[in-house]
Amino acid sequence: MAQTHSFNGRKRVRKFFGKIPEVAEMPNLIEVQKASYDQFLMVEEPSGGRPDEGLQAVFKSVFPIQDFSGASMLEFVRYEFDPPKFDVDECRQRDLTYSAPLKVTLRLIVFDIDEDTGAKSIKDIKEQDVYMGDMPLMTDNGTFIVNGTERVIVSQMHRSPGVFFDHDKGKTHSSGKLLFAARVIPYRGSWLDIEFDSKDIVYARIDRRRKLPATTLLMALGMDGEEILSTFYKTVTYTRDGDNWRIPYSAERFKGMKIISDLVDADTGEVVLEAGKKLTARAAKQLAEKGLKAIKATEDDLFGSYLAEDVVNYATGEIYLEAGDEIDEKVLKTLIDTGETEINVLDIDHVNIGAYIRNTLAVDKNESRQEALFDIYRVMRPGEPPTMDSAEAMFHSLFFDSERYDLSAVGRVKMNMRLDLDAEDTVRVLRKEDILAVVKMLVELRDGRGEIDDIDNLGNRRVRSVGELMENQYRVGLLRMERAIKERMSSIEIDTVMPQDLINAKPAAAAVREFFGSSQLSQFMDQTNPLSEITHKRRLSALGPGGLTRERAGFEVRDVHPTHYGRICPIETPEGPNIGLINSLATFARVNKYGFIESPYRKVVDGKVTNDVVYLSAMEEAKHSVAQVNVELDEQGGFVDEFVICRHAGEVMMAPRENVDLMDVSPKQLVSVAAALIPFLENDDANRALMGSNMQRQAVPLVRAEAPFVGTGMEPIVARDSGAAIAARRGGIVDQVDATRIVIRATEELDPSKSGVDIYRLQKFQRSNQSTCINQRPLVRVGDRIHKGDIIADGPSTDLGDLALGRNVLVAFMPWNGYNYEDSILLSEKIVSDDVFTSIHIEEFEVAARDTKLGPEEITRDIPNVSEEALKNLDEAGIVYIGAEVHPGDILVGKITPKGESPMTPEEKLLRAIFGEKASDVRDTSMRMPPGTYGTVVEVRVFNRHGVEKDERAMAIEREEIERLAKDRDDEQAILDRNVYGRLVDMIDGKVAAAGPKGFKKGTTITRELMTEYPRSQWWQFAVEDEKLQGELEALRSQYDDSKKLLEARFMDKVEKVQRGDEMPPGVMKMVKVFVAVKRKIQPGDKMAGRHGNKGVVSRILPVEDMPFLEDGTHADIVLNPLGVPSRMNVGQILETHLGWACAGMGKKIGELLDVYRKTANIEPLRQTLEHIYPDNDRNEPVRSYDDDAILMLANQVKRGVSIATPVFDGAVEADINAMLTDAGLATSGQSTLYDGRTGEPFDRQVTMGYIYMLKLHHLVDDKIHARSIGPYSLVTQQPLGGKAQFGGQRFGEMEVWALEAYGAAYTLQEMLTVKSDDVAGRTKVYEAIVRGDDTFEAGIPESFNVLVKEMRSLGLNVELDDTREAEQPALPDAAE
């Protein structure tokens, strides 16, 4: 045993079953959010040298702003942020937004314009810092605090800018003909569509308006007919040769053609190929090699072809024929008459090259650029008369003006790639060449060359993260502001103003506020547990502004695409209308600078797999062959098999090993975080895995978290990256620990400018967004040595730094008296009594005292007509005590509101006269506990408006807070003193003194003992002869003084914030928040689930003695129905049960060996067993090098059950499970004989029994159960409201009415439709009747009938009720009978 490893017991040790080594580090799971927003704000960058992206780019794109006359200009210089006013916790408590003030330096330049020459000269330059509103900051965990609540900005998937080619799949035209179309999508600006119609004419549309012939667009670009044709077609020259014509021969043009008439050499007259034969490519090439230069053509060959250029009489300028005209006899005669000996025709054969553009030109009525521009102008702005200037300006602004049109760097890169162009990615507008290239490519597609694009390919979809969404929003705000600035610059005397006077930052600030407050992508963070937080931050939504809508999204967009592999999880997506539109990022994926999702791959060089990792987007990956991660490799990293399964361009195929150039990094890389937490995922059906990954996000944090026996190795990563467990920022020694904070004296990364002390505040019983409880517990003890990144405190749902969403429970798979029919769950009472599935929920109640028209509301204990009993929990200020147990209807905060004056009765006057004023002019509006909620008050916060006198309770809370701050300051000061004075002693111990405190002899050697005789404050008076050392001493002293000052200043600042009044909404004088904690034990009706999508509702809680038990008397905790497994195909739960059983068996064995050690002090058997469990490899803990103390600590940790990790797609196989069961001394069948707890008889068959990890989900029966007595009614229909929140009733719908009709239950039906619902008079009568003890009543007219009548009257149909009874109607005459 060469080197001993100490094991500190602060982390969970897992036995790893994975066989594939991890090559790449998994990126931080919330990097997506943090990197994006950092790139937008660029706080760290020096303000002078920021690159043009993010906020800098927005300012650069809007500024400089010139006024309308050009006499002045406002330029942007730089921006910077002041430190935020309040820190994250203060913002949470005070309902504020965590943000930093944005200061922008602007420069106003005023010009002198010479009236004669128009020359400009600078007259004046002014610079000024302008406050431009607050910019929200991101917390360390990738969230935003907006008005006191944590929000997440979800990343959006949208179609990447660029050009896309597609066809209608034959749906438009009845013949099923494919109509091709191209679309140029910019990042912002007008869309350009170019499409074929059923007659093969090419049309262009701008912004989905009316279509125009594509040639109109080309003419507007400055081309004429001849130029258009010469761009799209080659020409063939027919030369007059006696009576015949000759055309040049080219092998390219003639290959593959069937020869209709003999092919005759024009020079020799010999027939080189007879009619009816096919000219193969080889034969065509041979003819050229033999020297065939030209062939004969007849006039018939000319007919049907098109002229390539205009035929003009240059003397008169008369145009005889135009380019594109079809040649017929008449045209040919004209040509021969004009004496043409050469005719250039377009090379169109209607097979490989169609005449689409020529036909479009023929259809197009526009002849010139002006007509084309006018035509476009009319389409874009119907009803306005065009002029050349306005039409030209409008056309230019559509695609060629960088203010209005932006392809973005991504769009330009995509366009260059698709069209083989080479424009710089700074060219963000369209060019003439781009439009021509698009039309050319479209025509080629129609001719059968090339492929259309797949818009669901991840190469054509990109991610917009927080930074980019925010950038777009801020640009909108600045543009609104720009208009106002321009107007103000023109209307004001510009010489006398400063930049501050021109700027009104409200629109910019409003745009930011609007985005964070009400954008569809700014969501209330799902904070149920750490996993739900992380998943929310990694979510990708195709919905939102500029995205899809649920109704319009078809099946294709939602479906899994081959390019999702390693980028988007194919499993985790919601069930229901959003399926496939909301996705989750895969574990190893990251987003590149262009917004495309990249996945990591290992490079394969010369058939050997290297550890060199490259990240590739879907576009780049398409060119490679990628091998799976579980391919068999030899020692040198070469492929064992001749042929390897690999993916290439979306297809899975067998490829020779020489062709493989990449390999996956990890088997986890194709799934998301939540799916990677499911052990044996490979054995579950995908539908159930989807439910499993979604339900883990709904698991409620339990009072005692317990990590799963059977994990996947992802647990510590999630706990760390979510920020639930606290990791040490730098190494050091623990100095102090209590439940609320940990103080660590740093020993690594010591920086003179920073404090040498790290204080970690722990969150205690805080309420999360979902009312679950956030509570952190320290894991360290005083004196522990900590390394950077060690977990020092556990949070909600974490256990020793591992994610722990549920509990390990002993499960038996068997039916039990029908109590687990249809996925019901039978539980043991022991689970309730041991608080296994108990959770704490914290509800927040808020009450505000406002200033009303009749006078201010008052928070007080003095409430009219309330018994002393009801006030027993309130203090003298009328606010409930902390620790009070409250029940439904109890008063939490007493509040009275002034009542309107009403005329007094004589009795009231008398009472007033006797007892003084205050009798009845206030009413009780106290805050009471809602029905069905019980709990304990855990926290009270009181907020007062500036200048409002604070009550006793507010003062007490304030004093407590200041004491806590003072304690923090004193502790930090004490550690600082200890550090600094310790260093001082080390520096001067044994040195010769040059001076010292009073009474000290110069020249004496300083020793530690000597120094202790003087008080610490005098130690600074020692001076040494060594000048260099003396300089260091002085530096230490000044640093110490600075640190002290900083500490005091920080303390004073915080105290000032505590004492200052709070910002309140208008009209609110005082606000009280009461937090009530509720302990929820598990009960029938609660929903539970495993990790494999096996969910159910608790049906009964059985006494322990009735539960089935094993031979040794161990009772099952939970009984599940075995029929829930086969049809659902989530066999993973059975494998987990077996492996969990083996884990517990091994744990029991270790417990027994621990007892042996305690009796005999022989540790060897224990050591050998642990070394057998954790074999020596790079994935397992180095147990062989543990010392005895570490072995005992480990044994104590695993005696309840050995934790193991079985990573997805690389986990334990059947043989591993069997081996582990055998090691634990259990049957390899995984089944045991069970005995019936009620009779003690054994069951007939052996039963599968083992440990399974069960979660309690956030669907608690307490939150759902609800019964209405008399409650609120809807104003219009007078029917009871619906839903628990409104204390509503149960809807009696159309179908329920049919049921009563079918039974003939006429009276019940009448009651349902009248007195129990909306017959206003009737229901009061019923109440009165019941009170009298009389049970007769009459139904009247339902209010909804009156609503119907009113609606009909609004349509002009008068409906009146006829009140006459049938009895009064006259009898009909006999004839009518």
Curated annotation (Swiss-Prot):
UniProt function note: DNA-dependent RNA polymerase catalyzes the transcription of DNA into RNA using the four ribonucleoside triphosphates as substrates.
Quaternary data: The RNAP catalytic core consists of 2 alpha, 1 beta, 1 beta' and 1 omega subunit. When a sigma factor is associated with the core the holoenzyme is formed, which can initiate transcription.
Record-stated family: Belongs to the RNA polymerase beta chain family.
Record EC number: 2.7.7.6
Catalysed reaction equations from the record: RNA(n) + a ribonucleoside 5'-triphosphate = RNA(n+1) + diphosphate
Native organism taxonomy: Bacteria, Pseudomonadati, Pseudomonadota, Alphaproteobacteria, Hyphomicrobiales
Keyword annotations from UniProtKB, A to Z: DNA-directed RNA polymerase, Nucleotidyltransferase, Transcription, Transferase
Range of residues in the leader sequence: none
Pfam families: RNA_pol_Rpb2_1 (PF04563), RNA_pol_Rpb2_2 (PF04561), RNA_pol_Rpb2_3 (PF04565), RNA_pol_Rpb2_45 (PF10385), RNA_pol_Rpb2_6 (PF00562), RNA_pol_Rpb2_7 (PF04560)
Gene3D superfamilies with a match to the protein in the record: 2.40.50.100, 2.40.50.150, 3.90.1100.10, DNA-directed RNA polymerase, beta subunit, external 1 domain (2.30.150.10), DNA-directed RNA polymerase, subunit 2, domain 6 (2.40.270.10), RNA polymerase alpha subunit dimerisation domain (3.90.1800.10), RNA polymerase Rpb2, domain 2 (3.90.1110.10)
Entry's Gene Ontology molecular function annotations: DNA binding; DNA-directed RNA polymerase activity; ribonucleoside binding
Name of the protein in question: DNA-directed RNA polymerase subunit beta
InterPro entries according to UniProt: DNA-dir_RNA_pol_bsu_ext_1_sf (IPR042107), DNA-dir_RNA_pol_bsu_external_1 (IPR019462), DNA-dir_RNA_pol_su2 (IPR015712), DNA-dir_RNAP_su2_dom (IPR007120), DNA-dir_RNAP_su2_hyb_sf (IPR037033), RNA_pol_bsu_bac (IPR010243), RNA_pol_bsu_CS (IPR007121), RNA_pol_bsu_protrusion (IPR007644)
One GO-annotated biological process of the protein: DNA-templated transcription
Naturally occurring in which organism (per UniProt): Brucella melitensis biotype 2 (strain ATCC 23457)
Top-rank EC class of the record's enzyme: transferase
Record's keyword annotation contains Transferase: yes
Any single GO CC term annotated in Swiss-Prot or TrEMBL for this entry: DNA-directed RNA polymerase complex
Protein origin, superkingdom: Bacteria
